[in-house]
Structures are given as C-alpha cells and as structure tokens.
A protein has these predicted regions:
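Two-component/phosphorelay signaling modules centered on CheY-like receiver
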Residues: 27-46
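Short amphipathic alpha-helix used as the core "switch/output" element in two-component signaling
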Residues: 56, 78-89
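Non-catalytic signal-transmission and effector/linker regions of two-component phosphorelay proteins
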Residues: 1-19, 29, 124-142
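Acidic catalytic/metal-coordinating carboxylates
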Residues: 50, 76-79
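Alpha4 helix (beta4-alpha4-beta5 surface) of REC/receiver domains from two-component response regulators
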Residues: 79, 100-115
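Acidic, metal-coordinating helix/loop segments flanking the phosphotransfer/catalytic sites
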Residues: 47-65
Length: 142
C-alpha cells in the first residue's frame, strides 16, 4: 500500500484532530513511521526534513505534537527546540534520539521537550506515547 501524507504548500489549514508533525530526514524510517502513525494510530501526519520546514509547517498547520529527530541536517533538532522556545511556542514535542544520555534528556527537557524517545523503538510504543500526550496536553500556543 502506498502511503500518502499531507503537503499543502499554500499553507491551507486543516481543521483535523490529532495532527502530528514528524521531522526526520531518514526517508526509510520516516516512511515506516508515517504509515504506522496514520494506519494504526489514526493520526494525520505532516513530514518535514529540515528545520525551516518544521517552523513553516507549525505555523501553517498547527500540529498537536511534534516528533523531532535530534540529528536533523544542518543545525539539528536542538536548534529547532531553541527556536520554538524563543518564539513562545508551547507544542508537545517528543525528541527522538539514538543516544539518550542524561545530558541529552536534561537539555531537551530544559528546551521544552515533553519526552525523549530512544531510537530504535516500536511504532506501537510511539503511538501510545502520542496518545498519552494528547490526553494530558493543554491547548498549544502556535
């Protein structure tokens, strides 16, 4: 089954519940996770590969949760977390990392990440964490 995810270059806002933004530059990983989040979690998923795409997608589509890779090209996921914090965004964010050291967890939390998720992980575990965040998340400011 070919997976489709939503790309609206004209910044069309969709009033869809459970909007997720996945930011990861690994195409294979992203495709598998996107498929699983949509098919098994029932989420509407947007995908961004680089920092500037993340910020544009947040502004346009107002996702409920950001799944953010710490190793994005150029400046990385921590740069995105700093930008979100500086701009006053309060978006539930799950930082995904292959190296969940105490320092990474501390730094991510200080920059506003809701949770640090070690890679690799099962998509079911991610779906459960997203559902948990959606239940307890206050309204987000975008």
């Amino acid at each position: 089954m070919l997976f489709r995810f939503w790309v609206f270059p004209d910044c069309t806002f969709l009033d869809i519940s459970k909007r997720i933004l996945l930011s990861d530059d690994n195409e294979g990983f992203s495709t598998l996770l996107l498929e699983s989040l949509h098919e098994h979690g029932g989420f509407h998923v947007f995908h961004a590969r680089e920092e500037h795409e993340v910020m544009e997608t947040i502004q346009c589509h107002k996702p409920h949760i950001l799944l953010l890779d710490d190793m994005l090209p150029h400046k990385g996921g921590f740069h995105v977390l700093r930008q979100l914090q500086e701009r006053g965004h309060r978006l539930s964010t799950i930082l995904m990392t292959v190296l969940p050291t105490q320092k990474i967890v501390r730094d991510a939390t200080e920059l506003g990440a809701s949770y640090v998720f070690p890679k690799p992980f099962s998509s079911q575990a991610m779906i459960e964490k997203i559902q948990e965040l959606l239940k307890r998340a206050p309204p987000t400011k975008h």
